[in-house]
């Protein structure tokens, strides 16, 4: 059933209020809408609602604040599980996303728990950048009355493993905070470490925070996000791939695919800005090559999560083969006594470099050894899903979800190598074939609720994906706000992703401006950050008019270069020094007017 929106003249809300209401309720289920309706009825009639009970004074019961700083959702899931544990222990707890935390109140926190991941080259998650910057600034307060604990999630295949957690932990201590527990740094397989840490936190806090009354334990932040979808990272939807289209030219150095996935009647919902999680299977040819290099058959039985499987099946479905790590290299060297690899052990930088440049199968090829099947399995990490920025809006595509996939391809001594998930989608799933997917919601990359707000989108390469979703949504909403796109890639003729669609949006007036940077079409390389500087005066006018700025793409280089260009534009045309420009951009971030989806 479709609910018709009544004419605006009959509504007691102005257009801006209506837009905010629609944005806040667009992804709610009927059950959630019913609860919201009852909540507002209770407010109107001054009746108590289950989640609006007044907590006891802080003097009687010190509150526990959990700050969740998540990039891919894992840190948020750990924080939510801890909140539930503390509520079950009848403790007064509040869970807040780092992007929503009013960080100036940190001085009044008595019991503070931080759960954080790390992105890029050791940076905090996007939603925690402002808090991180505040704590490391001269404005950070003393925290002598604060006890804290930090749980850090990371990936040991990266050089700056768990750096964000290390930063928060050391800075909170430096500001005078008392450690409740030593920091825990967890790898990709974080679940066991998180479970143990949560139990220790609950035990530590029981002695610090008196037990809350039943009404208090319900009232103090038990609600953060309510997900009623039956599909999740651990229980994905089995959908079907309906379109796999190469959208770069035949002479392009890049292989970029437009992928469409049919969600059927699953009811799975997403918003522009969300990501699609994809569970993939390793290439059977890669599995066969690795097994044969180790003088195994692939039929050997191995144990995976309590189940006995043939080695080939375990490697294809359950273990990471396309990402090597320093730990794997070190363990393989020690296990096999490899003369080639043992000299690397103890040298973190060399181990990291070798792992970053050498696939597991090539490590085995270059340093051959014989391992039994269980030893191989124990060496590897569990397979994890890959996240892709969603390139569609359900306002246009309904029961579909689109993604833009840059396929990773390269050669090693004449042998073709490819990325695990990208080659799975591009090469190994037939049309109408099955794909296991889930939605990773990202409330830190959202279109403005006010449809009149101007939007500036900066997305070179596959970073264009969410802005296709943005434009579909803005067109469907008939949003009067202006839209400006900055896009870049090597060549105009080969790499202009979704060219016809952008031209149509310009013709229809949906896309107000488009600035393009082709880095290889002339002698001097030109990137999107150069276009930002070139259009600095107009860019500053848009910012002064309230524009929201969005950046999507590579975290390590592009995002940093774009941010530097924005700072230069703000300083030059806003008449500010470097420090003031940095403060101005930080304020835009806090106001959700500067949002990034970087990876």
From Swiss-Prot:
FAD binds at residues 322, 356, 386-389, 404-406, 410, 419-422, 599. GO terms for cellular component: cytosol. Disulfide bonds: none annotated. Coiled coil: none annotated. Keywords: Amino-acid biosynthesis, Cysteine biosynthesis, Electron transport, FAD, Flavoprotein, FMN, NADP, Oxidoreductase, Transport. GO terms for molecular function: flavin adenine dinucleotide binding; FMN binding; sulfite reductase (NADPH) activity. Its EC number is 1.8.1.2. Its cofactor is FAD; FMN. It is an enzyme of class 1 (oxidoreductase). Pathway: Sulfur metabolism; hydrogen sulfide biosynthesis; hydrogen sulfide from sulfite (NADPH route): step 1/1. Residues 64-202 form the Flavodoxin-like domain. The keyword Nucleus does not apply. FMN binds at residues 70-75, 117-120, 153-162. InterPro entries: CysJ (IPR010199), CysJ-like_FAD-binding (IPR003097), CysJ_Proteobact (IPR029758), FAD-bd_FR_type (IPR017927), Flavdoxin-like (IPR001094), Flavodoxin/NO_synth (IPR008254), Flavoprot_Pyr_Nucl_cyt_Rdtase (IPR001709), Flavoprotein-like_sf (IPR029039). Binds 1 FAD per subunit. NADP(+) binds at residues 519-520, 525-529, 561. Alpha(8)-beta(8). The alpha component is a flavoprotein, the beta component is a hemoprotein. HAMAP family: CysJ. Belongs to the NADPH-dependent sulphite reductase flavoprotein subunit CysJ family. Component of the sulfite reductase complex that catalyzes the 6-electron reduction of sulfite to sulfide. This is one of several activities required for the biosynthesis of L-cysteine from sulfate. The flavoprotein component catalyzes the electron flow from NADPH -> FAD -> FMN to the hemoprotein component. NCBIfam families: cysJ (TIGR01931), PRK06214.1 (NF004859), PRK10953.1 (NF008197). This is Sulfite reductase [NADPH] flavoprotein alpha-component.
